[in-house]
Amino acid sequence: MSPSPALHAAAFQGIGAPDIQRFHINLSVGSNVNRYPAKQHARKVASKLGISRGLIYLVGKPTVFLDDSDQTIPFRQRRYFYYLSGANEPDCHLTYDIAKDHLTLYVPDFDLRQTVWMGPTISIGEALDRYDIDNARYAGSLQTDISGWLRLRGDDSQIILLHPDHRPPIEYEQDLFETKNLVPAMNAARGVKDSYEIEMIRKANIVSGLAHTAVLEKIGQMTNESDIAGLFLETCMTHGAPDQAYGIIAASGENGATLHYMKNNEDFGNRLSVCLDAGAEYECYASDVTRTFPISRTGEWPTPEVRDIYLAVERMQEECIRLIKPGVRFRDVHLHASRVAVEELLKLGVFQKDNSVDAIMASGAVSVFFPHGLGHHVGLEVHDVAEQSVMAATDDSSPRTRVRGFLMQPASAMSAALLEESMIVTVEPGIYFNRLALKNARTLPIARFIDFDVVERYYPIGGVRIEDDILVTATGYENLTTAPKGEEALDIIRRSSVKSSRA
């Protein structure tokens, strides 16, 4: 079934599937996207803090060496620091004087030995030109600057930290630091994206789409999960995105039943399909994309079972995406996905056919096959922060219930986070046949709802998951994910097979 046009992102308007492999995008930040809006973010965080005075102090990620080695751990900037600076450089610090609306970035002091071996660190002039800041200073002046601020501060002003152990290198009084409010304030600020952030996530998705397409074009020639992971990474790097938002999951066959499978080293053999969960990171912003497709030269599903489960998950995703708009409780969308899963598995006989959809839903048995939430925020982290998780309940009187590891239905209606315009969330339904989970389910009361003889036919599938990144707009949604799926993905496999046979 072809995905509804409404479920596609607009990023490839005018570009058909046959042309996507020839489409090379310019991913440099151009005239439409200015410098990273650090000052805007700082003001937003100060507003969430609800105070008019104080000094926010953040320390960036320092250079860290591997244990017992002279080699460094690959650098990854602390995301809270990046949100207030846009600086993807090690060994930096920043301060933001709330009363003066003054943002200062501290860069590493010049080190000749470092320059000879590793190249020069960023200079003051380069920092002022590159970043949306009011001032740039060398790190050696940090202690003097903060001490000077303390002498001039009012009695009600504090230095505001993310964590108690992130204190600046100064002599201090115990009551000088406030360490409880900055994390929730920054989480609330980061949950709703601005136009710059949306553009970065859109670009990350474009790169991911190109990489997923490259895999579809070559899947008929591949023999091992590592072939998939290697080509995906190579394609991302070629298009200006050398970092992945998370570890690539290239799970073939029953490995797809492990949600975060990352070994990526097994031969396909006679396996049916691949669950590829992989997303590029662009300028520190994540994409999160999952596609499931047959291991096939013909672009056809090898068995009715894997085809039927794919179509079930496809229905789950398409219906849920259409529900996305401001004011919707994401938990309600998750429950709709669960209900669709029950309906489909009941039709296939995986659930005993003498049971009703309502009875199965009330039992929580669907959690054996759909054990995770429908989605999460995406941003500077692949599982990004927000004032509240989209799957979180806020009503303590209605706790979630669990039965030996399985997340069950809510005991009663729950007050959960509402979607807001400019949030970006994933919609990633899945159906899985995990042998250990189902073995455990045999010992639970929910076993009476499951036909374990029928389940045997579905184990070779492992799992099917489809995942897109969805921007909440003023009136609904926009799908930022461009990676082909459904019939479009199968067509790419078919065309590539024809080209390969002619070569």
Curated annotation (Swiss-Prot):
SUPFAM superfamilies attached to this UniProt entry: Creatinase/aminopeptidase, Creatinase/prolidase N-terminal domain
Binding site for Mn(2+) 1: 288, 428, 467
Signal peptide: none
Details of cofactor binding: Binds 2 manganese ions per subunit.
Residues given in the record as Mn(2+) 2 binding sites: 277, 288, 467
GO-annotated biological processes: proteolysis
Database matches in Pfam families: AMP_N (PF05195), Peptidase_M24 (PF00557)
Cofactor names: Mn(2+)
Protein name: Probable Xaa-Pro aminopeptidase TSTA_094700
